[in-house]
Swiss-Prot record:
Residues 281-290, 303-314 have a biased composition (Basic and acidic residues). The lineage of its organism: Eukaryota, Fungi, Dikarya, Ascomycota, Saccharomycotina. Phosphorylated during meiotic prophase. Dephosphorylation seems to be dependent on DSB formation. Residues 12-22 have a biased composition (Polar residues). It comes from the Eukaryota. The keyword GTP-binding does not apply. This is Recombination protein 107. Signal peptide: none annotated. Interacts with MEI4, REC114 and XRS2. Component of the MER2-MEI4-REC114 complex. One of its GO terms (molecular function) is identical protein binding. Residues 1-22, 241-314 are annotated as: Disordered.
Amino acid sequence: MVARGRTDEISTDVSEANSEHSLMITETSSPFRSIFSHSGKVANAGALEESDKQILEWAGKLELESMELRENSDKLIKVLNENSKTLCKSLNKFNQLLEQDAATNGNVKTLIKDLASQIENQLDKVSTAMLSKGDEKKTKSDSSYRQVLVEEISRYNSKITRHVTNKQHETEKSMRCTQEMLFNVGSQLEDVHKVLLSLSKDMHSLQTRQTALEMAFREKADHAYDRPDVSLNGTTLLHDMDEAHDKQRKKSVPPPRMMVTRSMKRRRSSSPTLSTSQNHNSEDNDDASHRLKRAARTIIPWEELRPDTLESEL
């Protein structure tokens, strides 16, 4: 916002300076401008002013574009930070799931071992019971004991398989979710990398353009300072400007008697009894007014101009 305010101030200053320069040019008479525009000097000055305006406008646009690019880069950096945070969270969650998986798998292994030991113990018990009671229960068939063993083994096996399958499904779901999240984060990082590359290219091009514009503006400014004021050619204002530097010398030297007007001569002839102090005051006032009129007017050498040039310009 500060840079935009500066560019607005620069543009307003340039517009005011151009308006003042245009007013200075329009104060001269129309024949003067039409005649001397034939040489091409005034047109060159206008072209230089237009080029300066364009350079300032381009510089303001470049500053605005650089500000927008900086804002977009800040936003992208924020998005990258958020994505990195989500990625860290997902990785931590994935590690937790792996740890839980390892813990649950360890529990399953212990359960399997316990079940195997229990089955072995039961088999030992059954075998001992069969051996001890073989004589008493010869009439009974061995099919009943086998059925009991098969039922117990199938029941424990179903529990183990169900528990293992459930845990396996949960781990597969968690792995799929983490893979999708990692893929999305990778694609986002790739897009952000591409955007940052394009931003760096744009910033480099903007810097090169800005340096070129600054160099051109400096060259134009040096050229504008070196060239003389075209609007004062053919007038007596240049002599008045030279006389302004010798103001102290003119103040010390008394005005000549040829500068006295006819009204002063008549006043002296009509009133010879006036004091010398009043005469000196009136002479100083007339001299000051004469100098002001001389500085304010613009003399055009009409005698040096040919009538055919005036008719061609009209």
